[in-house]
Regions:
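N-terminal loops that bind phosphate or other acidic moieties
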Residues: 1-163
């Protein structure tokens, strides 16, 4: 398993492990099916990772397409869009720069597709601080750590946002 596919597996596991919490949160203002969608996204992530070749651009595109296939809901489509846009942004070269480009493109793609903005209690509120932290990094590992910290802070901040 490569570092990339290992990371994809961690995201898939986190989605599955938190599916009940997603259902609870979604049932407050929605139909409560976000946990099911999270599980379906995890299946798409794993299917894409299983076909990964080591070509970042192709692997991100494959994962996006697999998510779209397994989770054809609104949230699944947004998640897939993030990967597909990330795929379009990366190029040959530096891993840190490609990761920065990918996360920024994912944010922009999700915002455009979902017609959402910061402060609306969406995925963007976690992705934006992650992107900012990552874009300020000088090496990949510290950038990923900072991005994870930023994402957690963004998630926590949504609790105090008006619905």
């Amino acid at each position: 398993m490569s570092a990339f596919t290992d990371s994809v597996e961690k995201v898939a596991a986190a989605l599955e492990n938190n599916s009940k919490k997603f259902e609870e949160l979604d049932s407050v203002a929605g139909d409560g099916d976000l946990g099911i969608t999270a599980g379906n996204i995890a299946k798409g992530l794993r299917a894409g990772a299983a076909g990964a070749t080591g070509d970042l651009k192709a692997d991100l595109m494959l994962i996006g397409r697999e998510i779209a296939k397994f989770a054809p809901s609104t949230f699944g489509t947004l998640f897939a869009t993030g990967f597909i846009r990330a795929s379009a942004a990366v190029a040959d070269g530096d891993a840190l720069k490609n990761t920065q480009l990918a996360v920024t493109a994912a944010f922009d793609g999700i915002a455009a597709r979902g017609k959402a903005a910061l402060g609306e209690r969406t995925l963007l509120d976690a992705l934006h601080p992650a992107s900012v932290a990552l874009n300020g990094a000088t090496d990949l590992q510290s950038g990923l750590n900072a991005a994870a910290t930023g994402a957690r802070a963004g998630v926590t901040a949504t609790a105090s946002m008006a619905p």
